[in-house]
């Protein structure tokens, strides 16, 4: 579904977010494509369109979107974080050769044998990241995806 400015404004308002120009631009960068983006990628997309948005504004807005559950944070490692506009239950493949993150349908992975939880807590979710790499080095050199 293409995201229009009016549609993004309505979505932000439904989630209790004041739709400033910069928040709308950041939302457009995230929701107009079916990709997982880092904060730096969001910043480049937003600033590439026309506006001069600071890195702090992007991080603050992404944190607000996380708090309001508009996006999910996918931490591949401490230095590699993606923001995922797909908030439905699902998991991920992370290609260590290309840095690409792709979705795995939740129904494709069966999680069994979780340990007993301590008293007073409940499971909020289970996030699985399957790290993959090419078994054919020539594909990595050529920049081709698996």
Predicted regions mapped to residue ranges:
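Pre-recognition alpha-helix immediately N-terminal to the DNA-recognition helix
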Residues: 24-29, 41
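Basic amphipathic alpha-helical segments that dock to polyanions
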Residues: 58-65
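DNA-recognition alpha helix
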Residues: 33, 38-50
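Non-DNA-binding regulatory cores of transcription-related proteins
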Residues: 68-146
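Short, Lys/Arg-enriched N-terminal segment that forms or immediately precedes the first helix
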Residues: 4-16
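Short helix-coil-helix linker/hinge
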Residues: 19-21
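Alpha-helix C-terminal capping/helix-coil junction sites
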Residues: 13, 66-67
């Amino acid at each position: 579904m293409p995201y229009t400015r009016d549609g993004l404004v309505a979505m932000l308002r439904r989630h209790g977010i004041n739709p400033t120009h910069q928040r709308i631009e950041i939302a457009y960068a995230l929701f107009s494509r079916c990709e997982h983006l880092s904060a730096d990628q969001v910043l480049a997309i937003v600033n590439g369109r026309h506006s001069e948005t600071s890195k702090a504004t992007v991080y603050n807005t992404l944190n607000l979107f996380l708090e309001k559950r508009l996006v999910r944070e996918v931490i591949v490692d401490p230095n590699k974080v993606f923001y995922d506009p797909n908030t439905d239950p699902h998991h991920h493949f992370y290609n260590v050769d290309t840095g690409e993150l792709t979705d795995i349908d939740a129904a494709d992975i069966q999680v069994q044998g979780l340990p007993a939880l301590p008293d007073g807590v409940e499971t909020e979710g289970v996030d699985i990241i399957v790290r993959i790499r090419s078994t054919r080095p020539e594909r990595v050199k050529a920049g081709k995806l698996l």
